[in-house]
């Protein structure tokens, strides 16, 4: 190497920044032969060795620098980076914090601290550290990009999108930033923009596995399943041990109804990352969907580990399936109304076994549950809780009962309904609905308000026109929410009427919904609360369920009946978001239903 007049430490740092790591190490080692106590030079050597992947040597150099100069922030920074790289994340965090105590303006240390906090699961701390870094050095594009990813993890999609956009403005040739922007667009629901951003990332770097995986996610939401699968497979060719990419492949396979392949992908994802809660949960749901109950129920406990999960409402002694007479058991609802209804089907098993059961439930269901289960105590859920844990021997969330009492399809009872509507209201509704002399009264519900999968479960009322023309039927609105505009459009454009009872709030008055369902001869509905209510009442109910995306596991796969609700028939969509064939099948079946009455 030609002579350079600069100090060896400065020359070594410059060579490191240029990526000439071997030369940097050579310069620094030669200089340290003459100045073995130069802590800054040792720290710089640790940095170069770390970037080379020589972690043990880097650790030794950083530790020696700290022994000589405990107040040298860069040495603590390099030690922290090595510790994180060697899997000692918590120690790395401590070292980064020490570096920042010594130099609060050390932007790179704030950035690395953010990454380490993210690895440890402290997303809020990660975001805070990245924000400190970009306040100190606003031009750090990689930190803006990482901040965007952390904000996405925290569910702050708008802020994440802004941070990722700023990253690509600062560094238009930074492929990873474009990939993160693509992911942010995907989470924001802008899938075409997501595809464009990921394609830009891949124009800059075809070897970027994350961009391929993000592209696969966006393509999947556009319905391009084959292209999505190919993108995910390319990501895994580049990074075979990438748990997130393996999980994303599983999602695409599940969407394509390749359930065995999806199970294999989820299993591989959790082998690679044992703490990957979403992969464990999807594995659980696919196993349950296929009837593999023992393993599926056991893995269903991972729902508490998902980031979006609410904390357990009660956490004292858990019930573990003992059917001991007199045992005082507190049951509590943990999910939505439909889930509380479906899992309430298991309560009878507990009562018959002699357990003393108290059920804490959504207030809208409390009266209905008291009438339906007179041998248990029903408490309306409130905050703070209206029950005293000391009054019970154990507790269980409703969805946790299946693990112990529904181990196989044979364990599901062939009941005739377990909920009982208010008889007086049923009689009143029946009188109102039948005075016009129709052969059959059929309740319909066509939409789901679920934020994540509602669009996949929903139809438009206008799509039902052929069904609504079946003669001899009075159709009744069982759809919660404001349906006035949909019904008026149907009347004006198709000349069709759906009877609406304005005095029943189908969202809040679930007693009214139950009575109205009970007053019908048949209920036809998409997967929502109405489906659960009708099935739990034992009414004939025909369910429209999505092909894959939006299909909840408890409708199972390749079945046209329901293990949970014996009175239910299931019409499964064959092509995503195309309900035409299924609604036509319902039209034909309804014609036969009316003819036989």
What are these regions (language model features)?
Residues 1-597:
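Alpha-helical solenoid repeat scaffolds of the TPR/TPR-like class and their adjacent stem/linker regions
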């Amino acid at each position: 190497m030609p002579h350079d007049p600069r100090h060896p430490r400065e020359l070594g740092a410059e060579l490191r920044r240029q990526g000439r790591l071997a030369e940097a190490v050579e310069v620094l080692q030669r200089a340290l032969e003459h100045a073995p106590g130069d802590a800054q030079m040792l720290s710089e050597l640790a940095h170069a060795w770390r970037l080379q992947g020589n972690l043990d040597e880097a650790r030794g150099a950083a530790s020696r620098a700290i022994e000589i100069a405990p107040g040298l922030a860069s040495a603590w920074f390099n030690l922290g980076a090595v510790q994180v790289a060697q899997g000692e994340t918590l120690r790395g965090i401590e070292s980064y914090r020490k570096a920042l105590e010594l130099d609060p303006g050390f932007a790179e240390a704030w950035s690395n601290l953010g990454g380490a906090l993210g690895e440890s699961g402290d997303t809020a701390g990660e975001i805070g550290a990245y924000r400190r870094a970009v306040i100190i050095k606003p031009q750090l594009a990689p930190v803006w990009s990482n901040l965007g990813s952390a904000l996405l993890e925290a569910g702050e999609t708008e802020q994440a999108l802004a941070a990722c956009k700023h990253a690509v403005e600062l560094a238009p040739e930074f492929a990873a930033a474009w990939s993160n922007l693509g992911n942010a667009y995907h989470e924001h629901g802008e899938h075409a923009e997501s595809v464009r951003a990921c394609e830009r990332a891949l124009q800059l770097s075809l070897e970027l596995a994350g961009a391929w995986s993000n592209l696969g996610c966006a393509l999947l939401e556009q319905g391009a399943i084959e292209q999505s699968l190919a993108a995910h497979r390319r990501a895994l060719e580049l990074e075979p041990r990438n748990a997130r990419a393996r999980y994303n492949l599983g999602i695409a396979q599940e969407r394509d109804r390749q359930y065995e392949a999806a199970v294999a992908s989820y299993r591989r994802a959790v082998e690679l990352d044992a703490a990957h809660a979403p992969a464990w949960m999807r594995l659980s749901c696919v196993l349950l969907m296929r009837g593999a109950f023992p393993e599926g129920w056991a893995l269903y406990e991972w729902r508490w580990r998902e980031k979006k999960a609410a904390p357990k409402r009660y956490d004292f002694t858990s019930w573990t399936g003992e059917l001991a007479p007199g045992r005082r058991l507190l049951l509590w609802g943990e999910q939505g109304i439909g889930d509380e209804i479906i899992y309430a089907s298991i309560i009878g098993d507990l009562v018959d076994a002699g357990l003393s059961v108290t059920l804490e439930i959504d207030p809208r269901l409390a009266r209905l549950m008291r009438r339906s289960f007179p041998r248990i105590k029903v408490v309306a859920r409130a905050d703070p809780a209206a029950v005293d844990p000391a009054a019970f021997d154990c507790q269980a969330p409703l969805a946790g009962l299946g693990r112990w009492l529904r181990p196989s399809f044979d364990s599901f009872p062939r009941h005739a309904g377990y909920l009982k509507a208010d008889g007086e209201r049923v009689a009143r509704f029946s009188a109102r609905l039948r005075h016009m002399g129709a052969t059959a009264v059929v309740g319909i519900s066509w939409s789901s308000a679920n934020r994540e999968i509602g669009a996949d479960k929903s139809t438009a009322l206008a799509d039902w026109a052929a069904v609504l023309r079946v003669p001899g039927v009075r159709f009744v609105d069982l759809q919660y929410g404001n349906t006035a505009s949909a019904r008026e459009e149907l009347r004006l454009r198709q000349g069709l009427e759906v009877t609406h009872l304005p005095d029943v709030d189908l969202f809040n008055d679930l007693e009214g919904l139950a009575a109205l369902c009970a007053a019908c001869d048949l209920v036809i509905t998409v997967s929502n609360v109405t489906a659960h209510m009708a099935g739990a009442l034992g009414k004939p109910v025909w369910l429209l369920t999505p092909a894959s995306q939006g299909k909840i596991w408890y409708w199972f796969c390749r079945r046209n009946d329901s293990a949970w609700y014996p009175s239910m028939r299931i019409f499964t969509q064959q092509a995503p978001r195309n309900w035409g064939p299924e609604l036509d099948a319902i039209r034909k079946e309804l014609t036969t239903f009316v003819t036989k009455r």
